Amino acid sequence: MPQTAAAAPSAALVTLGCARNEVDSEELAGQLRAEGWRVTSDDSDVDIVVVNTCGFVASAKKDSIDALLGATEVGRPVVAVGCLADRYGRTLADSLPEVSAVLGFDAYPDLANRLQDVIAGRPVASHQPVDRRRLLPVAPVHRPAVAAEIGFRGHGWVPRARQRLDASPVAYLKLASGCDRRCAFCAIPSFRGSFVSRPADDVLAEGRWLAATGARELVLVSENSTSYGKDLGNPRALEALLPRLAAIDGIERVRVTYLQPAELRPTLIETIATTFGVAPYFDLSFQHASRLVLRRMRRFGAAADFLDLLGHIRELAPRAGARSNVIVGFPGETDADVEELERFLTAAHLDVVGVFGYSDEDGTEAARMPGKIDEQTIAKRVARIQDLADELVTQRAEDRIGEAVRVLVDAVAASGELVGTAAHQAPDVDATTRVVDAPRGVRRGDTVHARVVASEGADLVARACPEDES
């Protein structure tokens, strides 16, 4: 039952990790608000602090633990939720006695009551981890109904309207949860579960709500967006959904993220590359370029396949944005494999390259593989690839000088300069475009036409111009 205003409890919500976690946090904030709670990001005057953790790789786990310990310094009870909490549960609770409770995804529907128990000093059982892939049928088409029956995270439980936690013109919109791929290095499916799509009508309804709150760009997120619809009986559901999202009143741009190269079919490439209102932007999870390394990773493709894919994309959309992440130092990787990765990156002309050093993840196949590379060698290879990537990304930005861009404004300086993102730049994770000579009266969330006149590392500088000159 919702609390009265006088008795309204309060919670600070701290979010770490990826955009999917940001959506989870906003759903939890909306749920708590519907129960009469006040939710804020300021932990200075609240009853409890909730930290939505990330458990993806070693560095993310460390950041989450640091955030949990830091939150305890304000003298309020601290509760861990999110991926790290779901993945490690009681083990995490035992190692961090400073934290009042560790709750898994299955506690989300009853979160308000769990937090009330913590505030009141009542004992709250720590989460017991379970491999969430085992909770759903193997056949994807049977999953949505079963997910609803068992209250699987994000399915069957319809959250209250999200509470947006900032006024950004960009909003993240979740397409699905879970993943069916079995990459040797990745533990995500074990705690996020098997892949389950959200019904298109639900995605559209949330997109309209986000537009009504001031969102101008919708960024679609999931663990694997190319799989969207395979469990709904329509493996091309994303091709049908994108134009409908782009047609929502108030939405200037729709962007798809988390694309698997091996599943990127020609019809989806064409839809992303040519649909009005959809950013010609390809967030491609290559991970490496050596065929041998990729096979050990339990992934498909190789450098030649990836270059062919990029070539096809650029035939349809010559100015398309393309980004990827790569893992360096995977077990068995040789100097020749690293050289092949270097050749691929040089030929790929990517706008953004994320470089990660391999680290063992509990419960993964790769953690048990022979051929481990020592940390010092991995660090040297990471630095080598990162230096090359920085050089290549800077050159790619220089190559865009002279291009016409439409910039979604995120900030307006007192000088009148604007900062935002063009279609080839994803908010928060990619570079930005600074617009000079902008007309007066431009506000955050507006779109400005401009032409690129310079680059600053990966970032661009553009001069505002009339639409017919862009």
Question: Which role fits each region the language model picked out?
Answer:
Residues M1-Y228, T267, F276-V278, F282, ...:
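Proteins enriched for Cys/Gly/acidic motifs involved in redox and nucleic-acid/cofactor modification
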Residues L284, N325, L345, V353, ...:
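Hydrophobic, well-ordered secondary-structure elements that form the walls
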Residues G55-A60, A215-A240, R244, I248, ...:
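Conserved glycine-rich "GG(E/T)P / GGGxP" loop and the immediately following alpha-helix
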Residues G233-A246, P266-P280, E333-L350, E375-K380, ...:
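Short, electropositive alpha-helical surface patch
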Residues P2-Q3, R368-S470:
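Terminal RNA-binding accessory module
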Residues V256:
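Intrinsically disordered, low-complexity polar regions and short flexible loop motifs
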Residues E239-A240, A247-R253, L264-S324:
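Radical SAM/AdoMet-radical enzyme domain recognition
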Residues G89, S222-L232, E263-T267, F286-R298, ...:
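Flexible glycine/acidic-rich beta-alpha junction loops that bind and position SAM and/or redox cofactors
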